Amino acid sequence: VLELQGDFSLHHQTFSRLGIESVPVKVSSELDRIEGLVIPGGESTTMSLLIDTFKMREPLIEFGESHPVMGTCAGLILMAKCVPDERVKPLGFLDITVDRNAYGRQIESMTENVTYYFKQGTKVDLATTLIRAPKINSLGDSIHILGELDGSPVAVLSKHFLGLSFHPELDKIDIFHQILFDGDSPYYYKQLNQINAA
């Protein structure tokens, strides 16, 4: 779990519930000892600045070439290809355009029923917390939608990258951590990618 700034402790609790070991990542050398990464929620402008301050941009991009990465809320913003805010320099993992804080400021944070499509032909509605949530405005051809709120995508998967507009760790929705990091799960991303490609 990237621990430069933001909401990382609950991600460790999620991994603990799933029986998956997790460790903090605060410097680029610590990327060498992990097999996947969560970029947590927080303040995307601050996180973008700290990534450059600690010279982690290139190591993170290189890590993402061959390892699964999940971003929640601010983490989704940092994973996007395009963010129309010059204060944020995204990593470009997901071929999406993201609008920061599109669902409101922190005082307007909300819990909404989000419709999820984890497997073809099935959908599940779950109460989901959005805090100053970013909105995905455009999608590239490689993007598969795993969740929608009022017809807009809030959970997207592309290869080994998973981006979420919300905070699954707050609502103990563990399936997203399983998708990227639990090879024994029926929802593991390699199986979902095969389904989406079919």
Each model region followed by its residue ranges:
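Flexible, charged surface loops at secondary-structure boundaries
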Residues: E30-I34, G64, L139, V156-L157
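N-terminal beta1-alpha1 cap of cysteine-dependent amidohydrolase-like domains
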Residues: V1-E62, D174-Q178, D182-A198
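Amide-donor transfer/coupling interface in amidating biosynthetic enzymes
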Residues: R100-A198
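Cysteine-nucleophile active-site neighborhood
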Residues: E43-F118
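Hydrophobic anchor at the start of a short beta-strand
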Residues: S22-V23, V69, F161
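Cofactor-binding loop segments of dinucleotide-utilizing enzymes, especially the Rossmann-like FAD-
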Residues: L2-L4, A74, F166
